[in-house]
Amino acid sequence: MEIRRCMKCMHALAAGETFCSECGRPYGSVETEPFALKPGTILDGKYLVGEMLGQGGFGITYIGFDLLLEQKVAIKEYYPMSTGMVNRENSTTVVWSSAVMQKSGMEKGFDSFLKEARKMAKLGGIPGVVGVKSVFIQNETAYIVMDFIEGETLLKKLQRGGPMDYGTCISLMTPIMQALAEVHKHGIIHRDISPDNIMVQSDGKLVLLDLGAAKDLDIQGKDGNVQSSQMVAKHGFSPVEQYGQAGKIGSWTDVYAMAATIYYCCTGVLPPSATDRTIGDT
């Protein structure tokens, strides 16, 4: 049976419709990349994969549709493209370099991705944090299925409307700072907080996205610190410990990124790189 949905927005198309009435995309027209899953792919027997929403150093996020519950979802695929050691076969299967898996700790990163996704799925619905619906292995990699949050990113809101005053900013950000504190209580750190990972809903409330970058504080060390097995750094928002393999990561990592995000909200200026700030900073 043909599934007639727009691969950009997942709106249902009636028989005979040639354009999506929601976003205007011609039916059958897709935008994709050679390294991404082919739009129209079915995962875990029930998740329809649409176009890419974004990509990072270790994962790709797609818009998706739960064919059983009939609702939009966001699907995060573990695909550490920044290593240069993964490829796609037949538009689905991920092909790993055996040398990478054995020598560079990529297998450990894969296991950690799964472990943390499962832990986040058990957190329950923390207001202000995107919910995790499902975690599974397929195509030689791992997937996290999350709630799809309608709205625009905080980054787009700021680019469209300009900086906000401090009072407005703190009023908006306080709920997700409180949500982040709850996540930290469960021993999880986000590691990728920035304006493009915060969604502004139609009611003005913020939701923290992309928990696929999160890391368990209990993986290493008796001191509660974790050593980064995969480098994840975002210019202007990541603290210095995320720029090297030996960096000690903790709740302070998210605090730095949140403070940098608030700075950007109030000024519209990208904070200097943490590595640059260490030179002559007092």
Q: What are the roles of these predicted feature ranges?
A:
Residues S134-V135:
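Activation-segment/catalytic-loop signature of the eukaryotic protein kinase fold
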Residues N139-T153, K157:
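Conserved short submotifs of the Hanks-type protein kinase catalytic core
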Residues L172-M173:
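Activation segment signature within eukaryotic-like protein kinase domains
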Residues N225-E241:
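Conserved activation segment of eukaryotic-like protein kinases, specifically the C-terminal portion
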Residues E241-S251:
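Conserved end of the kinase activation segment
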